[in-house]
């Protein structure tokens, strides 16, 4: 849930609510209405009017870890889009590690690091001075070769097209962005134009001053509609008030089917062993099939389960019994993960995987501050003059919230969630490798061609009530 930090006022400064509200899933296509750009996916740099108030250019390109290793760029992919995808993956692992450090090892974690990155890129449109510099550095945007901060938005548009505008319709892909702005405020036209063209975020005026409660209900209803009722009443009473200037909302919904489904007839109750040594009952799915798999460093098992269409996969990382998942999480780097994925080979497997549903909701403010994004959240230091027409310097982000949802079952959707039938047809063939996720696992959902981490999390407690 959203805390009451939204819309607070400090030292006479007005706060902007950055609200990345997420339901697990793949992003939908970027669509822009009443835009001079007919199709952002085919547009050239000169076609997209990316002219924010301030531009940041680093003195030299900053290298990310392991960048010297050669990786093949996918066909028909702009090199800068590829670098942006890598930058997002570096941010993903760094942010995840900060978040995991703040949580108990028995807590489930789930988030969309790509969505957090995109939401703050939208905020970056209006940023200047050190606020802009920190946004570039924390989100690793400054690792993209010889490009300035304004061009990042063009590359984001192209990345979104590669990720979400696909011919494959075997998964349900829904995404929506929206800016809810105070109707008494005149917003910078360039900020509005770029937000709509690049990110599909239209501005909807609301009467924060005259009717804050109705504004809250309107935003909550919009979120509920865009997430098919999965996320409701996200913004609590009193969270929106007369001092609120802007609420930025991002929603994501995903519904995908396994390429190789688990038969419900093979699902049964088994024990799941949590990090604290306690055990609990889960519905354990089972199947025997060929999957991309590898036993990597220190006997950690890595398994890739494709969704229909093969362009999106779920990667499961299971440490050996003697090693905690927390240890693997802290050692993980984007280059290590890439190396593991490159080593996966088709293997005949016996897969035991819990059926589960996890939700996670948290403020990203503390983790981002620890990573160096400090000025944006400071009433005294924040510089966001490019958001409102008069170029005001009294805006800051009071807090930033993220909510994510993941459900895994035999179909890859909600179907047959309550059916438990006795085990049938389980093989005892000793020649087959076993992947048994009856203890905490790391979960990633990625786009294969660009190796973009779309979602990331930890299943530490999938237990049945």
Curated annotation (Swiss-Prot):
Site, Reactive bond: residue positions: 426-427
Signal peptide: 1-32
Glycosylated sites: 129, 168, 188, 225
Official protein name in the record: Antithrombin-III
GO biological process, one term: regulation of blood coagulation
Keyword field contains Cell division: no
Transmembrane segments: none
PANTHER family: ANTITHROMBIN-III, SERINE PROTEASE INHIBITOR, SERPIN
Annotated localization: Secreted, Extracellular space
Description of how the protein assembles with itself and partners: Forms protease inhibiting heterodimer with TMPRSS7.
Species of the source: Bos taurus (Bovine)
Keywords assigned by UniProt, alphabetized: Blood coagulation, Disulfide bond, Glycoprotein, Hemostasis, Heparin-binding, Phosphoprotein, Protease inhibitor, Secreted, Serine protease inhibitor, Signal
Reported modifications of this chain: Phosphorylated by FAM20C in the extracellular medium.
Disulphide bridges, residue numbers: 41-161, 54-128, 280-463
GO cellular component terms listed in the entry, alphabetical order: extracellular space
Subcellular location, principal: secreted
Residues the record lists as Phosphothreonine modifications: 64
Cross-referenced InterPro entries: Antithrombin_3_serpin_domain, Serpin_dom, Serpin_fam, Serpin_sf, Serpin_sf_1, Serpin_sf_2
PTM annotation (Phosphoserine): residues: 69
Binding site for heparin: 82, 162, 178
Family: Belongs to the serpin family.
Tissue expression notes: Plasma.
GO molecular function: heparin binding; serine-type endopeptidase inhibitor activity
SMART domains according to UniProt: SERPIN
Protein's job: Most important serine protease inhibitor in plasma that regulates the blood coagulation cascade. AT-III inhibits thrombin, matriptase-3/TMPRSS7, as well as factors IXa, Xa and XIa. Its inhibitory activity is greatly enhanced in the presence of heparin.
């Amino acid at each position: 849930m959203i805390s009451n930090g939204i819309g607070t006022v400090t030292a006479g400064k007005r706060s902007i609510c950055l609200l990345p509200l997420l339901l697990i899933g793949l992003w939908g296509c970027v669509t822009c209405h009443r835009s001079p750009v007919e199709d952002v996916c085919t547009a050239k740099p000169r076609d997209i009017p990316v002219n924010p108030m301030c531009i940041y250019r680093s003195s030299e390109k900053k290298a990310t870890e392991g960048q010297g290793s050669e990786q093949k760029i996918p066909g028909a992919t702009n090199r800068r889009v590829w670098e942006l995808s890598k930058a997002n993956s570096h941010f993903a692992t760094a942010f995840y590690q900060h978040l995991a450090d703040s949580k108990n090892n028995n807590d489930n974690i789930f988030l969309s690091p790509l969505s957090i990155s995109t939401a703050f890129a939208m905020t970056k449109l209006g940023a200047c001075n050190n606020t802009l510099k920190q946004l570039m550095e924390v989100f690793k945007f400054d690792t993209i070769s010889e490009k300035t901060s304004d061009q990042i938005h063009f590359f984001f548009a192209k990345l979104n097209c590669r990720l979400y505008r696909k011919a494959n319709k075997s998964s349900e892909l829904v995404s929506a962005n929206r800016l809810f702005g105070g109707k008494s405020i005149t917003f910078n036209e360039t900020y509005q134009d770029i937000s709509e063209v690049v990110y599909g975020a239209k501005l909807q005026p609301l009467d924060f001053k005259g009717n804050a409660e109705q504004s809250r209900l309107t935003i909550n209803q919009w979120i509920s509609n865009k997430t098919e009722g999965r996320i409701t009443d996200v913004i609590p009473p009193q969270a929106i008030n007369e001092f609120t200037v802007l609420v930025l909302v991002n929603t994501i919904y995903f519904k995908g089917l396994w390429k190789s489904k688990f038969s419900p007839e093979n699902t049964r109750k088994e024990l799941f062993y949590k990090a604290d040594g306690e055990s609990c009952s889960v519905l354990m799915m089972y199947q025997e099939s060929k999957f991309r798999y590898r036993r990597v460093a220190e006997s950690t098992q890595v398994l890739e389960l494709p969704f229909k269409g093969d362009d999106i996969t779920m990667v499961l990382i299971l440490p050996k019994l003697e090693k905690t998942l927390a240890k693997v999480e802290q050692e993980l780097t984007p280059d290590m993960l890439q190396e593991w994925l490159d080593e996966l080979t088709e293997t005949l497997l016996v897969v035991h995987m819990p059926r589960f549903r996890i939700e996670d909701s948290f403020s990203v403010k503390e983790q981002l501050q620890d990573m160096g994004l400090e000025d944006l959240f400071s009433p005294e230091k924040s510089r966001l003059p490019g958001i409102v027409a008069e170029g005001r310097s009294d805006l800051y982000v009071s807090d930033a919230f993220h909510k994510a949802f993941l459900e895994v079952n035999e179909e890859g959707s909600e179907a047959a969630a309550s059916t438990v039938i006795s085990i049938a047809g389980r093989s005892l063939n000793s020649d087959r490798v076993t992947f048994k996720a009856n203890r905490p696992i790391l979960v990633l959902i990625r786009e294969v061609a660009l190796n973009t981490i779309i979602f990331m999390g930890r299943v530490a407690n999938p237990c049945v009530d």
